[in-house]
């Protein structure tokens, strides 16, 4: 059978044809009927940055409470039993519902799922039954796909305007860009709106105090004050943690268990993840930041830990929004002391052209073609008190060059660079001692 648009020419086909004004939406609903089962409670999270972390945190909170929970998105499907890699943040409807049915069959009752703008725009999520939705923030991204920023934002808003049923929970970071429009859309849909953050009404953030690589949060919920030792760095992780807590609380969990669970959560893979440090104690972090806003926030998060210089290695993807490239360059120069511009996933584009667009807006930056070479140079340049951020690829285990995916990991490149730096330092010390 072929599912086709109302105006599609299908007379020559020798198989049954089902016409629909919205064939993508129809496919999603057909997939939902075919694979009817899904976890009882499904919470979707959308926004430019933070989706992966919020989904991971919510899964961990539910697990800590004793629920069978999973998360689905950029880093794959994660359950208590293991991980499954996915090709897309939001899979096509047939694949998605096949996974949902499998999770339900395994006994998973609670699922946190990322709702990407592509997935929302292409109606991949339309057949799902949601208990809650969350909004993190909205900044520039995916303008290679969406014709305008407004079109991109409208795709995100579909979650609250169309997919969540009236009465469902909507958790919104009140301090984020776009929050007012999302709140209005949720109220128009008659959703149960819950806002979090300094300007929030459900969870009010009173203060943040840095304690090493942890943060002490003071929050108020339903008239009670709570102190939380969040084991993560960065103000953006505070926002992500509060959104995930708001989802858990709004879906019935008790505040004592939720806020206790936040003290034990682990960051999502490749999200401001500490990899190791040099012999001089200079730490190196890997982060998925691939938008100007995400890069700024990651650098701002690490700045307090750099008593000396803050270094960053990054590039931009090929065949994607070209307008981001100068913005990324400006962001790096404004917030880091040493900037290394290298390759990300060049895809079909000439890598040098991508780097040139970044370098034009990043005076003083160092251009190095090979990503592993750039990481090695940056690591070798670290001195006591320095911090290095390797941004853009995060959890990814491949680099797309042309149409080929070459095995590559920032984690492995950093580990190799750290080992080489230590060996070089040891060799230098040994040579110095022999000449003493």
How would you describe each model-predicted region?
Residues 8-14, 121, 130-284, 307, ...:
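Acidic, Mg2+-coordinating active-site environments of NTP-dependent enzymes
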Residues 6-8, 74-75, 117-118, 138, ...:
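Short, ordered loop/turn segments at secondary-structure junctions
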Residues 4-6, 19-21, 73, 115, ...:
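Short loop/edge segments at beta-strand edges and connector loops
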Residues 17-19, 42, 69-71, 133, ...:
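Conserved beta-strand scaffold positions in the cores of enzyme catalytic domains, especially
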Residues 13, 26-174, 178-191, 305-306, ...:
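Phosphate-binding loop of NTP-binding sites
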Residues 25, 63, 190, 243-436:
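ATP-dependent carboxylate-amine ligase
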Residues 1-29, 33, 169, 177, ...:
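N-terminal leader/targeting and accessory segments in enzymes
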Residues 1-46, 53-65, 204, 227, ...:
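Short, basic phosphate-binding NTP loop
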